[in-house]
């Protein structure tokens, strides 16, 4: 992702974020059979673009109570210094105007606007004050802040690439984020025949092993709506 419009230098750009999204889209089409016209990929998305596409996704959900929604994001995250609430940072947003970004609590609320069979969130980002790049968007004085994360609602399941006090790294050899690379590899190896619990467990173990080798360990996280019983077995 290119954050140059915020006035920041190129070091805070997120390497391979667009590549992550394009490859994830390919697997949604080829492995899960998602119709091509029902997928939107938005490279270098501004806040306005992200809100617009979220509205499109919610409107799609309004047409079918058996709909399954997928939201994937690769890029920067951070948390509000005052509230500790985590946000996704579109390319025109920095830590200084973070509340104009996409808060995770608002994202979960939007995805639960209408009854759906399932809403699945995949986040290759971190919210600790560390970033998927060579430099931070805001000086944190070396302190990583654990964000205050709201729970998903309705039939919503959220996978994220690292725990609240960790950074998410990029896999330069593969030109992807570590989390996205192993997420897609796990889906590919299982030929799409895998439960959500198995997908999380296998991806998490692979990411943890690979990032331990570079001494930047990531422990992916899974959060499910407390009212969604049986999500573990969904394929």
Q: What role is predicted for each listed range?
A:
Residues 1-235:
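Cysteine endopeptidase catalytic domains of the caspase/legumain-like
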């Amino acid at each position: 992702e290119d954050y140059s419009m915020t006035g920041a230098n190129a070091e805070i750009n997120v390497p391979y974020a667009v590549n992550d999204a394009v490859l994830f889209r390919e697997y949604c089409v080829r492995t899960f059979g998602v119709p091509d016209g029902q997928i939107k990929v938005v490279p270098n998305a501004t806040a306005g673009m992200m809100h617009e596409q979220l509205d499109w996704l919610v409107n799609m959900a309004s047409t079918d109570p058996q709909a399954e929604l997928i939201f994937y994001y690769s890029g920067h995250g951070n948390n509000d210094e005052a509230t500790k609430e985590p946000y996704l940072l579109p390319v025109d947003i920095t830590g200084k105007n973070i509340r104009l970004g996409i808060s995770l609590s608002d994202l979960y609320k939007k995805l639960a606007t209408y009854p759906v069979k399932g809403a699945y969130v995949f986040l290759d980002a971190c919210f600790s004050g560390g970033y998927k790049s060579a430099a931070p968007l805001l000086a944190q004085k070396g302190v990583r802040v654990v964000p205050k994360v709201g729970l998903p609602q309705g039939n919503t399941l959220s996978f994220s690439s690292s725990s609240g006090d960790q950074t998410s790294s990029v896999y330069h050899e593969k030109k992807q984020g570590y989390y996205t690379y192993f997420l897609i590899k796990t889906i590919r190896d299982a030929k799409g025949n895998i439960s959500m619990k198995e997908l999380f467990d296998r991806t998490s173990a692979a990411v943890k092993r690979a990032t331990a080798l570079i001494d930047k360990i990531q422990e992916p996280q899974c959060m499910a709506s407390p009212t969604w019983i049986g999500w573990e077995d969904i394929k």
